[in-house]
């Protein structure tokens, strides 16, 4: 979902309220883990997203599903927040609210988000190398990696931090070679 002005007016207060609750109870780290769990659950279960977004599914059914799926994994405050979103008919905005919360948490902890695209999953040493490179690029002490797979890269990685892009993919190198060769003609 693109964050429009209306979207921002809805998302930000909920994300800020969750952050305020986390800070006042000294649970920012725990809430961060819980939100990451929820986002992962939504990512791996499109059916869950569809049920939560469906206005024809009764709120009590949505609450029962959330209690069953997330209650054992998340803090009680986070569960109550999810149930509040159901009551307020905002549960369909769960994913963008969680992403907004993560952005607030990164700002609070001075953490930089690096979006890494590669052909295959990075190994732990490769992840650490990317983290060190991003720390050098940004001067930040903490880096959060968001990884994505793209088989069209052929090999290598693309690292995006804010507006900076470091393209060390084979596809990018081939494109640069092609541009160089076409500039000679």
UniProtKB/Swiss-Prot annotation:
rRNA-binding as UniProt keyword: no
UniProt topology in membrane: Peripheral membrane protein
Molecular function per GO: proton-transporting ATP synthase activity, rotational mechanism
Compartments reported by the entry: Cellular thylakoid membrane
GO CC term (a single one): plasma membrane-derived thylakoid membrane
Entry's transmembrane regions: none
Cited Pfam families: OSCP
Main location: membrane
Keywords: ATP synthesis, CF(1), Hydrogen ion transport, Ion transport, Membrane, Thylakoid, Transport
Stated family: Belongs to the ATPase delta chain family.
PANTHER family: ATP SYNTHASE DELTA CHAIN
Role noted for this protein: F(1)F(0) ATP synthase produces ATP from ADP in the presence of a proton or sodium gradient. F-type ATPases consist of two structural domains, F(1) containing the extramembraneous catalytic core and F(0) containing the membrane proton channel, linked together by a central stalk and a peripheral stalk. During catalysis, ATP synthesis in the catalytic domain of F(1) is coupled via a rotary mechanism of the central stalk subunits to proton translocation. This protein is part of the stalk that links CF(0) to CF(1). It either transmits conformational changes from CF(0) to CF(1) or is implicated in proton conduction.
Subunit structure: F-type ATPases have 2 components, F(1) - the catalytic core - and F(0) - the membrane proton channel. F(1) has five subunits: alpha(3), beta(3), gamma(1), delta(1), epsilon(1). CF(0) has four main subunits: a(1), b(1), b'(1) and c(10-14). The alpha and beta chains form an alternating ring which encloses part of the gamma chain. F(1) is attached to F(0) by a central stalk formed by the gamma and epsilon chains, while a peripheral stalk is formed by the delta, b and b' chains.
HAMAP family: ATP_synth_delta_bact (MF_01416)
Protein name, entry field: ATP synthase subunit delta
Source species of the chain: Cyanothece sp. (strain PCC 7425 / ATCC 29141)
Taxonomic lineage: Bacteria, Bacillati, Cyanobacteriota, Cyanophyceae, Gomontiellales
């Amino acid at each position: 979902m693109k964050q429009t002005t209306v979207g921002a007016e809805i998302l930000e207060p909920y994300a800020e309220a969750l952050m305020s609750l986390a800070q006042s109870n000294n649970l920012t780290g725990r809430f961060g883990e819980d939100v990451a769990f929820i986002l992962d659950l939504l990512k791996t279960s499109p059916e869950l997203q569809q049920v939560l977004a469906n206005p024809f599914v009764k709120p009590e059914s949505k609450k029962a599903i959330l209690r069953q799926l997330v209650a054992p994994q998340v803090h009680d405050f986070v569960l109550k927040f999810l149930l509040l979103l159901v009551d307020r008919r905002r549960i369909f905005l769960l994913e963008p609210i969680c992403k907004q919360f993560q952005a607030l948490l990164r700002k609070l902890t001075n953490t930089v988000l690096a979006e890494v695209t590669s052909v295959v999953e990075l190994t732990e040493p490769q992840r650490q190398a990317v983290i060190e490179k991003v720390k050098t690029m940004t001067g930040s002490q903490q880096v959060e990696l968001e990884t994505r797979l793209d088989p069209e890269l052929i090999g290598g990685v693309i690292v995006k931090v804010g507006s900076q892009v470091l393209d060390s993919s084979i596809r990018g190198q081939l494109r640069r070679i092609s541009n160089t060769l076409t500039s000679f003609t």
